[in-house]
């Protein structure tokens, strides 16, 4: 009985978090298809064609591609572009495709940030725009109310969302039930719309109106925005609850609502100005606006939480500098708050709301990031099919090729909307890609320079003569290299002529798996003469904690008393140079990011009163 309750609870929670983005798409998808930047005449023929496109887009891109196929490609239970990237880079290590695929994964992560800025803006705007259905006089209040709602949402992030998070599931369940009931109520008026399930209507629409249908693809794809979240959030809820929630509630509710909007437009073509809020009687408009606003806030929360998670993954995978990561829940390790990400998103979202003014204007900006990410996911998962699942190559080509062809059609239909707003996610994607690759390249150059300057440990051990005194206690030297002597140790020997009785050379590494169990966290080897090499491993979904890791060294016969342990860190100062490696402007960007990174003591949770920092200068 308790297991059944847990399953139901997990299902309700999954509905509240996973399906928020795709669940709020009915607010604007049909409206933008018929009344957007490339309007389509509201006629039964066109309505049937668009409904058929919507149905098969949802079935192919979400149900078949993500729910059935890509959700099988988990990285030890975790999903998402960076988890998939880590899995694929591990599978292709040593192959020619390794580096290009890694770049593709970084591009997907960069596009995600463009998407995560647009989603809160377009979702909440589209909900509040329901006020215009009540009376056009309320139009002037749409942007201020949207800004107020979003400001409140971003302001509470630092306090965590555990308390209000319990309401997400029930509210979203109510939302999907409402979608279904509104759809059924309108389908009854024109039940013939259900015939649009047949793909012949979509095919005929494309053949008869090739240009119109091409434009329609650019807005029909709005019906699947958020589909990738089903894969991204797999680590939080598991594959089964997400699939169960999709097939039992979300998919039927979405399709019923889209077909209900189609039935409404057949009966009343004038309803195209905002078909969603005209699906019910007039007295329902205000309650629907309130419920829609709650649903879009929940959808936005899911995107914001996803942005925090991706930021942590990027830091751990060496794509971003250290940032402050705050755990907002003592019970749920996945609930984190990243201040820099939060406020960067907030100001970008505010700029979008104020700059674009309406969900219709923002719709043009929405599709590029989503379709670009979906296309990259298909490419990455094709290598999983071939190398991990060992599918026949002909089958891989047929399945991946078909999905890629569909993805590309939607991407092409959105790329033509660059001038109408599509430039924004491309701009954000370019900035994000530049930052991610600059940091990764910069750290690689730093490691190369340190290795070039490194002194072999055996040389130092031989040089420890009678003139070098041994201080009591333990010294832990943090170093990125797993061989050689850290610069901080060399500086200590040079200036103080002393080393501690026990010296630990500690290196923190990130595995290409989401989690590393405590049993595999540390590995300590005795080098001799009181020196030890310590490797500390974390997964890309974990936050490092060095004092906690040191307590695990008991298995190697070592105990650490924090009051007699000193931590020595190298504080690197970088000097941009004309050496080959990176353009001068990128070297300056890397230096700027390094200066503004969270201090190692904070990031690694090292007691500040036990830290000694020694400076070192490097040319990159």
Swiss-Prot record:
Topological category with respect to the lipid bilayer: Multi-pass membrane protein
MF (Gene Ontology): potassium ion transmembrane transporter activity; symporter activity
GO terms for cellular component: plasma membrane
Organism of this sequence: Rhodopseudomonas palustris (strain HaA2)
Pfam families: K_trans (PF02705), K_trans_C (PF22776)
GN (gene name): kup
Keywords for this protein: Cell inner membrane, Cell membrane, Ion transport, Membrane, Potassium, Potassium transport, Symport, Transmembrane, Transmembrane helix, Transport
Entry keyword NAD: no
Transmembrane segments: 8-28, 50-70, 102-122, 136-156, 168-188, 211-231, 246-266, 284-304, 336-356, 368-388, 393-413, 415-435
Superkingdom, taxonomy of origin: Bacteria
Annotated family: Belongs to the HAK/KUP transporter (TC 2.A.72) family.
Catalytic activity: K(+)(in) + H(+)(in) = K(+)(out) + H(+)(out)
Protein name from the UniProt record: Probable potassium transport system protein Kup
Location(s), subcellular: Cell inner membrane
């Amino acid at each position: 009985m308790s297991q059944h309750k847990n399953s139901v609870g997990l299902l309700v929670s999954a509905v509240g978090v996973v399906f928020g983005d795709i669940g709020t798409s009915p607010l604007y998808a049909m409206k933008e298809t018929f009344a957007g930047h490339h309007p389509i005449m509201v006629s039964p023929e066109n309505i049937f064609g668009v409904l058929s496109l919507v149905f098969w887009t949802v079935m192919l891109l979400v149900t078949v591609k993500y729910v059935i196929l890509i959700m099988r490609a988990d990285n030890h239970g975790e999903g998402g572009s960076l988890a998939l990237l880590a899995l694929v880079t591990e599978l292709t290590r040593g192959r020619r495709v390794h580096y290009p695929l890694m770049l593709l994964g970084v591009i997907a992560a960069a596009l995600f940030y463009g998407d995560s800025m647009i989603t809160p803006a377009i979702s909440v705007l589209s909900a509040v725009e329901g006020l215009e259905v009540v009376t056009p006089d309320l139009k002037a209040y749409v942007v201020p109310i949207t800004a107020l709602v979003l400001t409140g949402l971003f302001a509470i992030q630092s306090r965590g969302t555990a308390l209000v998070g319990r309401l997400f599931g029930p509210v979203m369940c109510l939302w999907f039930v409402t979608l279904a009931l509104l759809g059924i109520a309108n389908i009854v008026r024109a039940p013939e719309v259900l015939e649009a399930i047949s793909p012949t209507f979509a095919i005929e629409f494309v053949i008869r109106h090739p240009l119109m249908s091409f434009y329609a693809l650019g807005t029909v794809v709005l019906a699947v925005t958020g589909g990738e979240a089903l894969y991204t959030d797999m680590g939080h809820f598991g594959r089964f609850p997400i699939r169960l929630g999709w097939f039992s509630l979300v998919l039927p509710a979405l399709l019923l609502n889209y077909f209900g909007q189609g039935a409404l437009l057949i009966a009343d073509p004038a309803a195209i100005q905002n078909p969603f809020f005209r699906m019910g009687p007039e007295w329902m408009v205000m309650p629907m606006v309130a419920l829609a606003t709650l649903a879009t806030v929940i959808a936005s929360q899911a995107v914001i939480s996803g942005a925090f998670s991706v930021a942590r993954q990027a830091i751990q995978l060496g794509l971003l500098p250290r940032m402050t990561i705050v755990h907002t829940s003592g019970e749920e390790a996945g609930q984190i708050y990243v201040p820099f990400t939060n406020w960067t998103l907030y100001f970008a979202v505010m700029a979008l709301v104020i700059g674009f003014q309406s969900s219709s204007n923002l719709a043009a900006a929405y599709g590029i990031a989503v379709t670009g990410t979906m296309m990259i996911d298909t490419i990455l998962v094709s290598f999983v099919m071939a190398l991990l699942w060992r599918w026949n190559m002909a089958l891989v080509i047929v399945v991946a090729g078909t999905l890629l062809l569909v993805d590309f059609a939607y991407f092409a239909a959105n790329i033509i909307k660059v001038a109408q707003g599509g430039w924004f996610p491309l701009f954000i994607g370019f900035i994000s890609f530049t930052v991610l690759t600059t940091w990764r390249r910069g750290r690689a150059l730093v490691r190369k320079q340190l290795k070039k300057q490194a002194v072999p440990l055996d040389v130092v051990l031989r040089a420890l003569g009678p003139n070098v005194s041994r201080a009591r206690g333990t010294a832990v030297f943090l170093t990125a290299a797993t061989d050689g002597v850290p610069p901080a140790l060399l500086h200590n020997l040079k200036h103080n002529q002393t080393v501690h009785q026990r010296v630990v050379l500690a290196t923190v590494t990130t595995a290409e798996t989401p989690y590393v169990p405590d049993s595999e966290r540390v590995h300590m080897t005795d080098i001799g003469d009181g020196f030890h090499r310590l490797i500390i491993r974390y997964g890309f979904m974990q936050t490092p904690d060095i004092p906690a890791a040191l307590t695990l060294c008991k298995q190697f016969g070592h105990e650490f008393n924090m009051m007699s342990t000193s931590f020595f860190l190298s504080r690197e100062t970088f000097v941009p140079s004309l050496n080959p490696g990176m353009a001068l402007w990128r070297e300056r960007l890397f230096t700027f990011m390094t200066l503004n990174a969270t201090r190692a003591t904070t990031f690694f949770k090292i007691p500040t009163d036990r830290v000694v920092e020694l400076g070192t200068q490097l040319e990159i």
